[in-house]
Amino acid sequence: MALPDFSMRQLLEAGVHFGHQTHRWNPKMKPYIFGDRNNIHIIDLAQTVPLLSRALQVVSDTVARGGRVLFVGTKRQASELIADSAKRSAQYYVNARWLGGMMTNWKTISNSIQRLRKLDEILNGDAQGFTKKERLNLEREREKLDKALGGIRDMGGTPDLMFIIDTNKEKIAIDEAKRLGIPVVAIIDSNCDPDLIDYPIPGNDDASRAIALYCDLIARAAIDGIARQQSASGRDLGASIEAPVEPTLVEGGTEA
């Protein structure tokens, strides 16, 4: 495995260079702006390329050392792409609504996840002893919890890295990451504050094609990290004095 390749042409075709209308910009984005055309800011892709490459390396390195990456994107055009890419790379996601305290109050979130598991147990069984109305209420509760927490139910703790689409919309998530010292990789459009992000990637955060490209590249970087982790485990096993029983390796890059 290797880090995913991408080209300037791919970025252009996906519309990564199109920012917002010039009057909507955040002046802190000035270093990343190439110019403007028809009152639309044009993002400098010559800076996007190395910063995106750096972010992909960070994702791969995090996963290679056993870390967890949380994909966050709740806007309509990002929601499905965020979930699909996280599942494909055996990572975690929030794609419906960021609940306040999702990271900073993990204990309460863990209790809700336990409730979700319990509801699964009840409803996947015979669910005897419940009236039709009671069962319907349980199904609605499970559906609500699964929508909010389904993407993090198996995370087992706070993540080691967060990947975020739309830093303005997901400001609460970024604030919580900062409080806990969780590094953030994020797309920064012309109306964003780059100072909030550890690993900024200048680019359009609204176009579906651009979001699809980011999600695909981040997912493939995570899959590369899984391959590196498994390869390192294999080397460690081979270096052992006594040859252990060979463990069954689970393919972490398969699609969920």
UniProtKB/Swiss-Prot annotation:
Q: Does the keyword Ribosomal protein apply?
A: yes
Which keywords does this Swiss-Prot/TrEMBL entry list? Ribonucleoprotein, Ribosomal protein
Molecular function in Gene Ontology: structural constituent of ribosome
Q: Which GO terms describe its biological process?
A: translation
Provide a GO CC annotation, any one. Answer: cytosolic small ribosomal subunit
Question: What Pfam families does this protein's entry cite?
Answer: Ribosomal_S2
InterPro entries per UniProt: Ribosomal_uS2, Ribosomal_uS2_bac/mit/plastid, Ribosomal_uS2_CS, Ribosomal_uS2_flav_dom_sf
User: Gene3D superfamilies attached here?
Assistant: Glucose-6-phosphate isomerase like protein, domain 1, Helix hairpin bin
Q: Which HAMAP family match?
A: Ribosomal_uS2_B (MF_00291_B)
Q: Which family does it belong to?
A: Belongs to the universal ribosomal protein uS2 family.
* Protein name, entry field: Small ribosomal subunit protein uS2
- What is the organism of origin for this protein? Rhizobium rhizogenes (strain K84 / ATCC BAA-868) (Agrobacterium radiobacter)
